[in-house]
Amino acid sequence: MSWQNNLRSVSPYIAGEQAELTDMIKLNTNENPYPPSLQVQKVIEDFKSDNLRLYPSTDAKVLRKALATYHHLNTDQVFIGNGSDEVLSLSFLTFFNSEKPLLMPDISYSFYPIYCGLYHIPYQKIPLADDFSLSVNSYFQENGGIVIANPNAPTGMAISLQEIEEILQNNQDSIVLIDEAYIDFGGESCLPLLEKFDNLVVVQTFFKSRSLAGIRLGVAFGSAEAIAHLYDMKNSFNSYPIDSLAQKIGEASLNDETYFQKSVSKIITTRENFKKELIKLGFQVTDSKTNFVFVHHPKVDATTLFKALYEAKIIVRHWNQARISDWLRITIGTDREMNTVIQFLKEYLKNKEKSY
């Protein structure tokens, strides 16, 4: 058993539960409740299986060009990876190689400190305010890089384009990575700032707003130089991370803008209606610009409520983590699913009142 002495110990990321029961209302991993566009479905139906014997494009050239056109960028400003988690991982490894600490909010995507541990990146967590807002002035200090999810997860809150520009202006010797995984649901993308700042890297994903969680497509945008370094790092690990079908599906999803906008708009409308109903029930709800809400009830322990929802076959997300252990994150599903949640909460809180 001496081989165990040479193991590299890690504390892995704990993903949201993937429920095996089909009658569960799954609102814990921020998946889109609606199917991909018909154009995506047609690509899948028309895909020739014989193509699977060939390696895919190493840099997803056609999809890169489509994304560049969609966002009015040059192709060499686009990087594509196997899901945004891979893109983030490679970005941390590529850009954050300083003895100075990487700055990040204390409440944010829990993969960030895991990457830092894996790659021996020193980091410093900057506390959010009591209302979970972010103070840009806190990032005007010496650092080896900055990573901010905007909108943030799990709080759902966003900072403005002007605030991001202030951070960039005050940190021109560091890479500022903005994780825009949820940007399509109401945040303001900082992609226009790429024209002014070569130290900006923006990461996005296909799975949340385009209903493509199952194919794993993530993307980074930056200066041509930054993206070239990112590809150098990628090619040191895996030359072919994006399979042929995924590349075609990604391209098709960009070609159906009407469906995309309709799907996103529907989720936003459902979210706002759901927030209003939660507030009526006494919940505190953050100003979410994502496809989820972050909620707290002053009279109900979050762990207890999480278990009660689970027993009612409704799965949401809870973290036993400092400052947010009494909060729940609830993905926005269909109107019917969210109405079911509201009806359960009404009954649950009514019974709770009787027991006081």
Curated annotation (Swiss-Prot):
Domain of life assignment: Bacteria
Signal peptide, first to last residue: none
Organism: Lactococcus lactis subsp. cremoris (strain MG1363)
Any one Gene Ontology BP term: L-histidine biosynthetic process
Cited CDD domains: AAT_like
Subunit annotation: Homodimer.
Protein's recorded name: Histidinol-phosphate aminotransferase
Gene Ontology terms for molecular function: histidinol-phosphate transaminase activity; pyridoxal phosphate binding
The protein's enzyme class: transferase
Catalytic activity from the UniProt record: L-histidinol phosphate + 2-oxoglutarate = 3-(imidazol-4-yl)-2-oxopropyl phosphate + L-glutamate
